[in-house]
Amino acid sequence: MASSTKVSLRRPPRPQVMYSLKPKVVEFDKVWVQLRPSIIDIINLRPITNVQWHHKFSDVYDICVSIPTPLSERLYNEVKACIQEHVRQKRQDIVDVDPDLLLQEYHKMWRVFHEGAIFIHRLFGYLNKQFVKQKRCTDLDNFAQYAAFLQIPDVKEIGCLALEIWKEDLVKTILPQLVKLLLIAIDNDRKGNFPHIANEVSGVINSFVKMEETDFDVVPAEGARYKARESTTAFYQESFEKPLLTDTEQYYSALAQKMLTDLSCSEYMEQVIVLLEQEEMRAKKYLHESSVEKVITLCQKVMIKAHKDKLHAVCHDLITNEENKDLRNMYRLLKPIQAGLSVMVKEFEEYVKKKGLEAVSRLTGENVPQQFVENVLRVYNKFNDMKTAVFMDDGEFSSGLDKALQGVVNSKEPGQSVPKASERLARYTDGLLKKSTKGLSETDLEAKLDSAIVIFRYIEDKDIFQKFYSKMLANRLIASTSISMDAEELMINKLKQACGYEFTSKLSRMFTDIGLSQELSNNFDKHIADIKTVQPDVKFVPTQTMILQAGSWPLNAPQLSTNSNNQTAQDVANFHLPRILQPVIQEFEKFYTGKHNGRKLTWLFNMSQGDVRLTYLDKQYVAQMYVYQMAALLCFERRDAILVKDIGEEIGVSGDYLLKTIRTILDVTLLTCDDQNLTADSLVRLNMSMTSKRMKFRLQAPQVNKAVEKEQEAVANTVSQDRKYYMECAIVRIMKTRKVLKHNALVTEIMDQTKGRFSPDVPFIKKSIEDLIEKMYIQRTDQNDEYQYLA
């Protein structure tokens, strides 16, 4: 029997044309007597020769095309009766089998019958094509005989017919016994008593699907025999899947209750993960692929979803204690559950924010910006690693981490109206990009700039950062204290990637101005050289001039300030440029206006510096100082001692700024004064015995009042005004596009447009809308909370 089965499982050779295709008269009974035994042999997988196969194939063809009337329908009915008789015999055989051997015997019978049905289907291929398919088409032709068609029994192709008979006449009679034995086998597998008939269990279960195959004409790829055939799972689902799911739910519900009683939460989670993995492997081993997800979802429902409150109850402690292993297990279990992670995400977010606020509170010392950035980065790196390792970079936890750090970075200190993060980050980057004795490699510098961008993305008031950063960049560029122009450009490109071109457009123009200024200075030097060629006695102090666009640089000339509260502007309003600088300044103005007629130059003497060579001392020193300091020191060219007020009258500087200027010169001991407190009546002397370890040194800029606080106030005022203009422009752009818009919709679009620069509050938005209504850019409509654009 084994030998014959092995032979019959090979695909039979395709029939060759060995017979006449011409229709002829056929004696049905005579042909059928010879055909019927072959059907039984084939369906039992008994071997037949090629000649026999071709003869039987020819017999089927002859019957289907016989004259004067084709005998297809009679052949179909006889084949059906033959298969029914065969299946009834098999049913009797299986009924008599020992119950303990039922699965094995059924599986053996099924394998033979299923394979035999496939070959029978091929043998009767012409009958399927000529009778079955044509009958279906003609019965439905134009729906003319639709009512009659409803009374005709379903005509199936031979392969489908054989499986239908198997299902109806055999399987359904023993289905309860089969299902019971299958469930027992799976239950034993769950308990560790692995059945020795695993292949038979899987084969019987999948027979419930295969017996509903509908397409026997598909030729599967080699190594994937018959898997490509279409089938439905209705019978499988109703007869086996339903009882299986019921049994599974009962089993794991009871098991979950027992484990919760006997195990800790940590142990419970570990055990559930193991059970889920085992059940998934078991489902893939035994069940149809459509059942795998259903079984796992059901297990998750009874072991996780039903008890998620118990898991949530310990979540706070696990996160607070940073029990990463348990948290990873909890994440794996709750991830597939709808809204299962909400509590974990909330606890994670709150814990990160708590640790972050602790890290940035009570910062003291001179390096607060560096402490702030490094502490925030420490928190970010720690919990970003935790998010990756524990929560698999899950989007919900990424969002929670971002919200937490946004809350940390934008937190306000007591008594502060705006967060300090923007200023601190700007000062931190200023420290990185300034020349210093502690050099960084290009790789280290870029890594630190990348870290700064991480924090920058969390800052809500990006416009405040922009103001501070542009001021500090301007100082670096003017004073030539940048570590390198490549590093400056690298940072600007990173800001551009984070916020777009508009955010960095002014910063880029500052770079352009520096390049153009260098070219202009070179041309001016050539111009001076040409003058000296003609007039050798003319003396010009060597200079390097920067031409800076007023709209791009965050700089102001104090002498032109219209702010009545600006005391510095009043103190330097009548400043007299030193005579030694006047020729070159006048010549440069003449040179520049000759090339750029119509442009106006405003000198920023408060930012202008020069080198003064000191030749009256034992050694020749070079002091780098600001123009106001230079003017004051030059007063001592003809005198050794002068009253402070006389210096002020001579250089045109007065008030507190004059005192600050003199004090900076006293600080480096170029001048001396006997008075403890410097006043306008104090007498200052030139220090003829001054010494310094450095041959070249720099004087500090005069500090007017509290410079940092003044800078913060100036930035706050500028930002407030810029926000007002930006907000009004955004509203006008939106309304010009929309024409008519509801209040809430307008607020939403405003928030979306401004989020890249700052986060406006609702009162500020409302005030901006009211201002535009007064200016008649928009108006209210007759509808409630609706605005209309006015062209």
Curated annotation (Swiss-Prot):
Q: In which tissues is it expressed?
A: In adults, highly expressed in meiotic cells and oocytes. In larvae, expressed in many proliferating cell types: P cells during the L1 stage; seam cells when they divide at every molt; vulval and somatic gonad cells in late L3 and L4 stages; and intestinal cells throughout larval development.
- Looking at the record, the residues that make up the Cullin neddylation domain are 722-784
Q: Where in or outside the cell is it found?
A: Cytoplasm; Nucleus
The annotated consequence of gene deletion is: RNAi-mediated knockdown prevents the release of sld-5 and psf-1 from chromatin prior to prophase in early embryos.
The location annotated for the cross-link Glycyl lysine isopeptide (Lys-Gly) (interchain with G-Cter in NEDD8) is: 736
Q: Which domain of life is it from?
A: Eukaryota
Q: Does the keyword Plastid apply?
A: no
SUPFAM superfamilies (UniProt xref): Cullin homology domain, Cullin repeat-like, Winged helix' DNA-binding domain
Q: In which pathway does it act?
A: Protein modification; protein ubiquitination
Q: Which InterPro entries match?
A: Cullin (IPR045093), Cullin_CS (IPR016157), Cullin_homology (IPR016158), Cullin_homology_sf (IPR036317), Cullin_N (IPR001373), Cullin_neddylation_domain (IPR019559), Cullin_repeat-like_dom_sf (IPR016159), WH-like_DNA-bd_sf (IPR036388)
**What SMART domains does its record include?**
CULLIN (SM00182), Cullin_Nedd8 (SM00884)
State the GO CC annotations: Cul2-RING ubiquitin ligase complex; cytoplasm; nucleus; SCF ubiquitin ligase complex
Return the PROSITE patterns for the record.
CULLIN_1, CULLIN_2
Sorted keywords for this record are:
Cell cycle, Cell division, Cytoplasm, Developmental protein, DNA condensation, Isopeptide bond, Mitosis, Nucleus, Ubl conjugation, Ubl conjugation pathway
Family in the record: Belongs to the cullin family.
The annotated subunit structure for this chain is: Component of multiple CBC (Cul2-ElonginB-ElonginC) E3 ubiquitin-protein ligase complexes formed of cul-2, elb-1, elc-1, rbx-1 and a variable substrate recognition component. Component of the CBC(fem-1) E3 ubiquitin-protein ligase complex with fem-1, fem-2 and fem-3. The CBC(fem-1) complex interacts with tra-1 and promotes tra-1 degradation. Probable component of the CBC(lrr-1) E3 ubiquitin-protein ligase complex incuding cul-2, elb-1, elc-1, rbx-1 and lrr-1.
User: What does the protein in this record do?
Assistant: Core component of multiple cullin-RING-based CBC (Cul2-ElonginB-ElonginC) E3 ubiquitin-protein ligase complexes which mediate the ubiquitination and subsequent proteasomal degradation of target proteins. As a scaffold protein may contribute to catalysis through positioning of the substrate and the ubiquitin-conjugating enzyme. The functional specificity of the CBC complex depends on the variable substrate recognition component. May function in ubiquitin-mediated degradation of CKIs to target cki-1 for degradation.
Q: What is the name attached to this protein's record?
A: Cullin-2
Organism lineage reads as:
Eukaryota, Metazoa, Ecdysozoa, Nematoda, Chromadorea
The gene for this chain is cul-2
